[in-house]
Protein backbone atom coordinates (compact mmCIF):
# COMPACT_ATOMS: atom_id res chain seq x y z
CA UNK A 1 0.00 0.00 0.00
CA UNK A 2 1.35 3.41 -1.00
CA UNK A 3 1.77 6.10 1.63
CA UNK A 4 1.02 8.84 -0.91
CA UNK A 5 -2.52 9.90 -1.65
CA UNK A 6 -3.91 10.09 -5.16
CA UNK A 7 -6.33 12.73 -6.36
CA UNK A 8 -8.24 12.74 -9.62
CA UNK A 9 -10.21 15.63 -11.11
CA UNK A 10 -12.28 15.51 -14.30
CA UNK A 11 -13.55 18.49 -16.26
CA UNK A 12 -15.56 19.22 -19.33
CA UNK A 13 -13.36 21.37 -21.53
CA UNK A 14 -9.59 21.58 -21.76
CA UNK A 15 -9.19 25.10 -20.29
CA UNK A 16 -10.68 23.87 -17.02
CA UNK A 17 -8.29 20.94 -16.66
CA UNK A 18 -5.36 23.16 -17.62
CA UNK A 19 -6.32 25.76 -15.01
CA UNK A 20 -6.84 23.04 -12.40
CA UNK A 21 -3.51 21.33 -13.07
CA UNK A 22 -1.63 24.61 -12.87
CA UNK A 23 -3.36 25.66 -9.64
CA UNK A 24 -2.84 22.23 -8.06
CA UNK A 25 0.92 22.04 -8.60
CA UNK A 26 1.38 25.66 -7.55
CA UNK A 27 -0.71 25.37 -4.37
CA UNK A 28 0.12 21.96 -2.94
CA UNK A 29 3.36 20.01 -2.75
CA UNK A 30 2.00 17.47 -5.22
CA UNK A 31 3.13 15.86 -8.45
CA UNK A 32 0.98 15.76 -11.56
CA UNK A 33 1.43 12.13 -12.61
CA UNK A 34 -1.12 11.69 -15.34
CA UNK A 35 -3.57 13.09 -17.83
CA UNK A 36 -6.35 11.20 -19.58
CA UNK A 37 -8.66 12.31 -22.34
CA UNK A 38 -11.82 10.68 -21.03
CA UNK A 39 -14.00 11.37 -24.04
CA UNK A 40 -15.27 14.19 -26.17
CA UNK A 41 -14.26 17.37 -24.31
CA UNK A 42 -13.72 15.48 -21.01
CA UNK A 43 -10.29 15.46 -19.41
CA UNK A 44 -8.91 13.91 -16.22
CA UNK A 45 -5.75 14.78 -14.31
CA UNK A 46 -4.13 12.74 -11.56
CA UNK A 47 -1.98 14.09 -8.73
CA UNK A 48 0.01 12.35 -6.00
CA UNK A 49 1.44 13.50 -2.71
CA UNK A 50 0.93 13.71 1.01
CA UNK A 51 -2.76 13.43 1.99
CA UNK A 52 -3.00 16.99 3.34
CA UNK A 53 -1.19 18.40 0.30
CA UNK A 54 -3.46 16.54 -2.13
CA UNK A 55 -6.50 17.94 -0.27
CA UNK A 56 -5.09 21.48 -0.48
CA UNK A 57 -4.25 21.06 -4.16
CA UNK A 58 -7.67 19.57 -4.96
CA UNK A 59 -9.42 22.56 -3.36
CA UNK A 60 -7.31 24.89 -5.51
CA UNK A 61 -8.03 22.84 -8.63
CA UNK A 62 -11.78 22.87 -8.03
CA UNK A 63 -11.70 26.64 -7.50
CA UNK A 64 -9.65 27.11 -10.69
CA UNK A 65 -12.16 25.14 -12.76
CA UNK A 66 -14.97 27.31 -11.38
CA UNK A 67 -13.10 30.42 -12.56
CA UNK A 68 -12.22 29.10 -16.03
CA UNK A 69 -14.62 30.41 -18.67
CA UNK A 70 -16.80 27.66 -20.14
CA UNK A 71 -15.28 24.91 -17.99
CA UNK A 72 -17.33 22.51 -15.90
CA UNK A 73 -16.21 20.26 -13.07
CA UNK A 74 -17.49 16.75 -13.73
CA UNK A 75 -16.14 14.85 -10.73
CA UNK A 76 -13.21 14.50 -8.34
CA UNK A 77 -11.92 12.05 -5.74
CA UNK A 78 -9.10 11.69 -3.22
CA UNK A 79 -7.88 8.24 -2.15
CA UNK A 80 -5.62 8.58 0.93
CA UNK A 81 -3.57 5.40 0.44
CA UNK A 82 -4.44 3.47 -2.72
CA UNK A 83 -3.89 -0.27 -2.64
CA UNK A 84 -0.87 -1.53 -4.59
CA UNK A 85 -3.18 -3.51 -6.90
CA UNK A 86 -4.91 -0.26 -7.90
CA UNK A 87 -1.52 1.37 -8.56
CA UNK A 88 -0.44 -1.60 -10.66
CA UNK A 89 -3.47 -1.51 -12.96
CA UNK A 90 -4.61 2.13 -13.16
CA UNK A 91 -2.40 4.94 -14.54
CA UNK A 92 -1.80 6.60 -11.16
CA UNK A 93 1.78 5.58 -10.34
CA UNK A 94 4.81 7.83 -10.43
CA UNK A 95 6.89 7.28 -13.57
CA UNK A 96 10.31 8.38 -14.77
CA UNK A 97 8.83 11.34 -16.67
CA UNK A 98 7.58 12.96 -13.45
CA UNK A 99 10.20 11.73 -10.98
CA UNK A 100 12.15 15.02 -10.93
CA UNK A 101 8.96 16.87 -9.95
CA UNK A 102 8.24 14.32 -7.23
CA UNK A 103 11.72 14.81 -5.80
CA UNK A 104 11.21 18.57 -5.62
CA UNK A 105 7.96 18.18 -3.67
CA UNK A 106 9.57 15.84 -1.16
CA UNK A 107 12.35 18.24 -0.15
CA UNK A 108 11.62 19.70 3.27
CA UNK A 109 10.62 23.34 3.47
CA UNK A 110 12.87 25.36 5.76
CA UNK A 111 11.35 28.54 7.13
CA UNK A 112 8.01 29.98 6.17
CA UNK A 113 9.33 32.34 3.49
CA UNK A 114 10.98 29.72 1.25
CA UNK A 115 9.71 29.64 -2.32
CA UNK A 116 7.95 26.40 -3.31
CA UNK A 117 9.09 26.46 -6.94
UniProtKB/Swiss-Prot annotation:
- Subunit relationships: Crystallizes as a homohexamer. Interacts stably with CcmK3, forming heterohexamers that can make dodecamers. Heterohexamers have a 1:2 CcmK3:CcmK4 stoichiometry. Upon expression in E.coli forms large aggregates.
User: Has keyword Oxidoreductase?
Assistant: no
What the protein does comes down to: A probably essential, minor shell protein of the carboxysome, a polyhedral inclusion where RuBisCO (ribulose bisphosphate carboxylase, rbcL-rbcS) is sequestered. Hexamers form sheets that form the facets of the polyhedral carboxysome. In PCC 7418 there are several CcmK paralogs with presumably functional differences. This subunit can probably make both homohexamers and heterohexamers with CcmK3. Both hexamers can also make dodecamers, formation depends on buffer conditions.
Recorded source organism is Halothece sp. (strain PCC 7418)
Keywords from the UniProt entry: Bacterial microcompartment, Carbon dioxide fixation, Carboxysome, Photosynthesis
- Gene Ontology MF terms in the entry: structural constituent of carboxysome shell
Please name the Pfam families in this protein's record: BMC
Q: Which InterPro entries does this UniProt record tie to the protein?
A: BMC_dom, BMC_shell, CcmK, CcmK-like_sf, CcmK/CsoS1_BMC
The record's listing under Gene3D superfamilies reads:
3.30.70.1710
Which processes are annotated in GO (biological process)?
carbon fixation; photosynthesis
* Protein name from the UniProt record: Carboxysome shell protein CcmK4
| Chief location of this protein within or outside the cell | other
Q: What is known of its domains?
A: The tight homohexamer forms a small pore which is positively charged.
> What family name appears in the similarity comment?
Belongs to the bacterial microcompartments protein family. CcmK subfamily.
The record's section on PANTHER family has: CARBOXYSOME SHELL PROTEIN CCMK4 (PTHR33941:SF13), PROPANEDIOL UTILIZATION PROTEIN PDUA (PTHR33941)
Subcellular localization = Carboxysome
Amino acid sequence: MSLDAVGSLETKGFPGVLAAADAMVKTGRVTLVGYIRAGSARFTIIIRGDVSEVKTAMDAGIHAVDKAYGAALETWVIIPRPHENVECVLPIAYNENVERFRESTERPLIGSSQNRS
